[in-house]
Amino acid sequence: MTMPVNGAHKDADLWSSHDKMLAQPLKDSDVEVYNIIKKESNRQRVGLELIASENFASRAVLEALGSCLNNKYSEGYPGQRYYGGTEFIDELETLCQKRALQAYKLDPQCWGVNVQPYSGSPANFAVYTALVEPHGRIMGLDLPDGGHLTHGFMTDKKKISATSIFFESMPYKVNPDTGYINYDQLEENARLFHPKLIIAGTSCYSRNLEYARLRKIADENGAYLMADMAHISGLVAAGVVPSPFEHCHVVTTTTHKTLRGCRAGMIFYRKGVKSVDPKTGKEILYNLESLINSAVFPGLQGGPHNHAIAGVAVALKQAMTLEFKVYQHQVVANCRALSEALTELGYKIVTGGSDNHLILVDLRSKGTDGGRAEKVLEACSIACNKNTCPGDRSALRPSGLRLGTPALTSRGLLEKDFQKVAHFIHRGIELTLQIQSDTGVRATLKEFKERLAGDKYQAAVQALREEVESFASLFPLPGLPDF
């Protein structure tokens, strides 16, 4: 491109074309990307979304996410930026912090919040960086038992998560017979391991956590207690499940699951008086704020994603409405309806049910596994994910399916609708068993998928898919009207 000279451009047509490019809508500017988005939008519209960590953000959240706030750099914190022109960014971040505390009914004298983490994993790692020295000890629920990768997962042969690479982690487990967390074993192991931090958080656990018990164990070992409420943050805001804030020192969360915002993260931390020195009577204050803020920036991140902070602020405002509370109660009611319907159809639900938004279906009694069932259901426009069950010997062939109700509840499905969803799932698993019988139990997943894609089963797959898509299309999809 020829550079402008004395305020005029030598190639006015080219410069005009440049201006036009900046003003073009996506469908004209990039047809390939636009078509991919349209295809994904249609997949979401005609499919049944049962992945427990997914939801449908509101139009308002998506509009904030696609705003001019994407353009602004703002390293630092409100009132302490490394760039000029941040007065409105400061206003936005302060508003988001205020709403975050209000949404969880927290006293700003006792709690603070950092809303800059890019997502949940960076938020968790920032807390570890702030509170646990390198190679310090942490304890989290084991991934195969329902924990999260960032809680320190490793195998016998390899440290998988960065958490397990830079810190020493010891997992706690569930009772393989009941599926419930074994708090007695956790207490015993904590006495031997002496962790600096205990994580109260899950990614596939259908029961409420015993925060008081976990805090007692943490106190006995001089450890911090951190809750990772990423999956249940919307339920907590609505008062549908117990709040971790009463017992925890730090609480992290994502904002796009049950909270139904955009993809981002938050870290809540205690502040104010921690204790009183019994000898001097002097108040001892928490120092978590400076440690955590420094770990987020400049420790691990650069400039915050201001468009995402705006989306979070919008979601938090929505989370304080009566409509949101009604929605969260329906999420739990729908999950119980799904669990009961599948139980009646002969399926085993780990822990026997659910207190929250998800269930884990154990397919071992059916003679199949989650990987095969997931592929068949996906071919029938039902999205869910394979997951390990308590007692599984290999994560490469997990026995379970994780099913969640937040996304479909956002579309307006009620208990009776989830009973129908359960029957769709059942028919998909019955088809899985037919294909598995045809291929043999020793067949690899690749061989199973090849048989699934063959002509023999396409009529059955298509018939179920058409029923699913016809049913799903009855319910509106939240979001932007153009997609």
Curated annotation (Swiss-Prot):
GO biological process: carnitine biosynthetic process; cellular response to leukemia inhibitory factor; cellular response to tetrahydrofolate; dTMP biosynthetic process; folic acid metabolic process; glycine biosynthetic process from serine; glycine metabolic process; L-serine catabolic process
Keywords: Acetylation, Cytoplasm, One-carbon metabolism, Pyridoxal phosphate, Transferase
Mechanisms controlling activity: Inhibited by tetrahydrofolate concentrations above 40 uM.
Record-listed E.C. numbers: 2.1.2.1
Compartments where located: Cytoplasm
SUPFAM superfamilies for the chain: PLP-dependent transferases
Keyword S-adenosyl-L-methionine: no
Gene3D superfamilies linked to this entry: Aspartate Aminotransferase, domain 1 (3.90.1150.10), Type I PLP-dependent aspartate aminotransferase-like (Major domain) (3.40.640.10)
Signal sequence segment: none
Annotated metabolic or biological route of this protein: One-carbon metabolism; tetrahydrofolate interconversion
PROSITE patterns listed in its UniProt record: SHMT
UniProt entry tagged with the keyword Ligase: no
Source domain of life: Eukaryota
GO cellular component, one term: mitochondrion
Residues bearing the modification N6-(pyridoxal phosphate)lysine: 257
Enzyme class: transferase
Primary site of residence: cytoplasm
UniProt cross-references to InterPro entries, sorted A to Z: PyrdxlP-dep_Trfase, PyrdxlP-dep_Trfase_major, PyrdxlP-dep_Trfase_small, Ser_HO-MeTrfase, Ser_HO-MeTrfase-like, Ser_HO-MeTrfase_PLP_BS, SHMT-like_dom
Function: Interconversion of serine and glycine.
Record PANTHER family: SERINE HYDROXYMETHYLTRANSFERASE (PTHR11680), SERINE HYDROXYMETHYLTRANSFERASE, CYTOSOLIC (PTHR11680:SF59)
Recorded family membership: Belongs to the SHMT family.
Assembly description: Homotetramer. Identified in complex with ABRAXAS2 and the other subunits of the BRISC complex, at least composed of ABRAXAS2, BRCC3/BRCC36, BABAM2 and BABAM1/NBA1.
Identification of the protein by name: Serine hydroxymethyltransferase, cytosolic
Organism annotation: Homo sapiens
Gene that produces this protein: SHMT1
